[in-house]
C-alpha cells in the first residue's frame, strides 16, 4: 500500500511539474508575440541573455528583434531541438572578433512566422532563435567568445 502511495505521489508531482513548464512556455510565447506586435523593444530586449556576449552581436540581435516589430505574427511556438539544432547550437561560429559560442545550453527553439502586407504586396518571414533557461526564465542566449 505504501509503495502505491509513493508511486501515485511521484506521478502527481511530475504531472504538476510538466504542467508548470507548459504554462511557463505559453506565457513566454505570448509575451514575446505581444512585444513583437506592439513594438515593445524593452520587453524584447529583456528576453536576451547577454552575460558574456560579444557587444557587436548583442547590437545585431537587438537590431534583428526590432526589424520585424509591428508585423503580424501568424505563428509563434517553442519547438523541441532536432539533432541538427543541437549540433548547430554547440558548434563554434565565426563572429566579428573570432569564434563565438552560445553562453547557455539551448533547450528549445522559438519559431516565428510573420506576415507583412503593404502597397507592394505581402511577404512572410520565418525566424528561429535558440531558447535556454536561466534562473527559471526562458531567454535567448546571445553568443560570446568560446571558452
What residues fall within each predicted segment?
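Sec-dependent N-terminal signal peptides
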Residues: 4-14
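Short, low-complexity N-terminal intrinsically disordered segments enriched in polar/charged residues
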Residues: 16-38, 46
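Short, exposed beta-strand/loop patches in secreted or surface proteins that constitute
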Residues: 36, 100-103, 130-132
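Short, well-ordered alpha-helical segments enriched in acidic and aromatic residues
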Residues: 40-58
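A mature extracytoplasmic/lumenal domain signature
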Residues: 48-51, 80-82, 116, 144-146
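Surface-exposed, charged secondary-structure patches
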Residues: 62-124
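Short beta-strand edge/turn micro-motifs at domain boundaries
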Residues: 116-147
Amino acid at each position: 500500500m505504501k509503495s502505491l502511495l509513493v508511486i501515485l505521489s511521484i506521478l502527481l508531482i511530475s504531472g504538476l511539474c510538466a504542467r508548470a513548464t507548459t504554462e511557463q512556455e505559453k506565457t513566454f510565447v505570448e509575451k514575446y508575440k505581444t512585444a513583437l506586435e506592439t513594438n515593445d523593444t524593452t520587453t524584447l530586449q529583456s528576453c536576451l541573455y547577454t552575460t558574456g556576449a560579444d557587444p557587436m552581436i548583442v547590437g545585431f540581435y537587438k537590431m534583428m528583434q526590432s526589424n520585424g516589430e509591428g508585423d503580424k505574427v501568424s505563428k509563434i511556438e517553442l519547438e523541441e531541438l532536432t539533432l541538427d539544432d543541437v549540433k548547430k547550437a554547440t558548434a563554434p561560429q565565426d563572429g566579428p572578433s573570432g569564434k563565438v559560442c552560445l553562453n547557455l545550453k539551448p533547450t528549445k527553439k522559438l519559431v516565428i512566422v510573420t506576415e507583412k502586407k503593404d502597397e507592394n504586396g505581402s511577404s512572410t518571414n520565418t525566424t528561429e532563435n535558440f531558447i535556454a533557461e536561466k534562473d527559471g526564465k526562458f531567454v535567448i542566449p546571445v553568443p560570446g567568445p568560446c571558452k
